[in-house]
Every structure is written in C-alpha cells, then in structure tokens.
Design a protein with these regions (language model features):
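Low-complexity, intrinsically disordered or signal/transmembrane-proximal segments
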Residues: 12-15, 36
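Residue-identity detector for glycine
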Residues: 24-26
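Terminal targeting signals and extreme-terminal segments of soluble enzymes
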Residues: 32-297
Length: 297
C-alpha cells in the first residue's frame, strides 16, 4: 500500500523534513509516528534503558550534526564508571575529557578503575565508535574531609530568576540536540550575532531528566551552550570540541534551572579557549570548566 507523503517525513542522511522534495534514488518515505517512536527519546528515557555493558545507539534527537552530542557521551561515560565503581564510590570531583574522534554509530563504553584509595578513586572510561576510540574520560571521585582551609571567591553574575527571562528558540539551523533543553538568555550575546564580547549567559534546564543521578544530569547539560566564540560570527560554521576539563564545586540539586556562563578568552589559529561556570538557582557555584574548541572559520 503506498504511503501518504503528508503523513511521512523525508529522510536523507540525518535531515528530516515534513514536506518531501523531489524524491531521488536515496530517498525513503517513513511514517512520522514510526520516526518519533524509534528515533526520539528524552534523557530520562535514555538512562532508563542504558546498559553500559551493551552497545548504545543514540536517538536522532541527540545528534549534533553527524555525531552524538558530546555532553550525552560524557554523561554516559560517567554513568558507566559509576556503575563499575560500585556503591562505595564517592562523588565525582573532577574530570578530563578528550574527544578523540567522531561518535557516529553505536557506542561501546569500557570503564576502568586505575586506583582506589581511602578518599580518592581514579577511573577512566573509553568510548568506542566503529571500533575507533571516540572519547577518553579520566575521572577523580573524592570523599570530603575535615579541613581548616575554607574560602569561596566565586561571584555569580547579577541576574534575575529564570522566569523573568523569555525562552529562546535556537532556530531551524541548530543541531538536533539543542532542542532537548530549555534556554532563557540572561545577558551576554547570542550565537552568530556579530558581538564584540564573546560571552554567553543563559538559564538552562533539561526538558526531562527525572530519575537520573544529579551529577550525571549536570554533565549532560553542561555542554548545552555552543562555544562562546561563535557570538562574534554572523553565519554558521563547523565546530568541534577537542578537550573539556571540569570540576564539581558543589553537589547539584535535581531537576532545576542552572545558570550557564561561557566566555572565550583567547581565539587564534582556528582554536578557541573558553571558560565555563555553572550556578544553581539558589546561587551556588556547582561546576567550573574549560574547553578547547576547533573553529573552522
């Protein structure tokens, strides 16, 4: 029985359109309800079914171009390590992530315990895609200790609460993964706005992340903003994060808005070095990080 084009989506590579163009040799008509059922999933649904010992295939709505959204891959790598570390594993304190190559197909996660001490455990997770290393993540898990050293000189930007700002639509050219988050600009600039100060400042939250470890959910959200340097551009260009270092400052609460700030301090030779800070709704700094980003412009 022929399919009704009005109830189908045209798929070629990873592009989806509700109205099919002239159909070529590589075109396929698939019912929209089938696409939504098989290729769309919330973060909560992903982690409900994720088994670190089995290959993982990312849904279409978590792709960033042809590759899997880096925040999701990092969160899955952390979750795999936490499962392997057991119930006595202390909370994550720091992580160093290298995006070695593209994760374009099914992913396989291999966690390893490097050292387990009284208060510090060091682990790695390697993620493979198409038999090639796609991500290498080193994690340090620490138990808190009594200390006479106590200070906090961090300062949250002067912003109002999330409801005081309007929701921002990233637009049709944004990658699929961008639509899994709610975003409310609270200052700084917008992507591709030709700004002179490369800084993004937005309240961000997951669409659906119930039942996920709060730190795992935070890692999945922490990379939700595009690199700050693209605020200086006026047109879309290819981007690729190479390294990501992060430190957990305070334990995040589940299912809330977070204030994300990313700033590019140096950009030259096709690479941008950017800092990121994340605060909770109550004003606590929960994460600090730095990324090296390749910009093809």
């Amino acid at each position: 029985m022929p399919l009704n084009p009005e109830k189908c989506a045209f798929i070629q590579s990873v592009q989806v359109s509700s109205t099919p163009p002239s159909l070529g040799a590589g075109a396929v008509l698939i019912p929209i309800d089938v696409i939504q059922e098989k290729t769309m999933a919330s973060l909560a649904e992903i982690f409900q079914s994720f088994d670190p010992s089995s290959p993982f295939n990312a849904p279409e709505n978590w792709l960033q171009g042809r590759t899997v959204y880096g925040g999701l891959t990092a969160a899955l790598a952390l979750h795999a390590a936490m499962q392997a570390g057991g119930s006595d594993l202390p909370p994550l304190k720091s992580a160093q992530i290298t995006f070695v190559g593209p994760a374009m197909h099914e992913q396989i996660f291999k966690p390893t315990v490097l050292r387990q001490g009284k208060s510090v455990t060091v682990m790695t997770t390697d993620c493979f895609s198409s038999a090639q290393l796609a991500l290498h993540m080193t994690m340090v898990f620490t138990a808190s200790r009594d200390s006479r050293i106590l200070h906090d000189y961090s300062q949250r930007p002067a912003v109002s609460q999330p409801d005081d700002y309007s929701l921002w639509d990233a637009g049709p050219h944004a990658p699929n993964c961008a639509h899994n988050f709610q975003k409310r600009p609270a200052g700084g600039a917008l992507p591709f706005s030709g700004a002179t100060d490369p800084e993004l400042l937005m309240w961000v939250r997951h669409d659906e992340a119930q039942g996920i470890d709060p730190i795992v959910a935070l890692i999945a959200l922490a990379d939700a903003l595009p690199p700050a340097s693209i605020t200086t551009l006026t047109a879309h260009v290819p981007l690729s994060t190479i390294t990501w270092t992060l430190d957990i400052v305070n334990a995040p609460a589940p299912d809330q808005w977070f204030l994300l700030k990313t700033s590019s301090h140096v950009a030259a030779g096709g690479y941008s070095l950017q800092d990121m800070e994340i605060w909770s709704e109550s004003g606590e700094l929960v994460l600090r990080g730095r990324q090296t980003v390749a910009i093809f412009a």
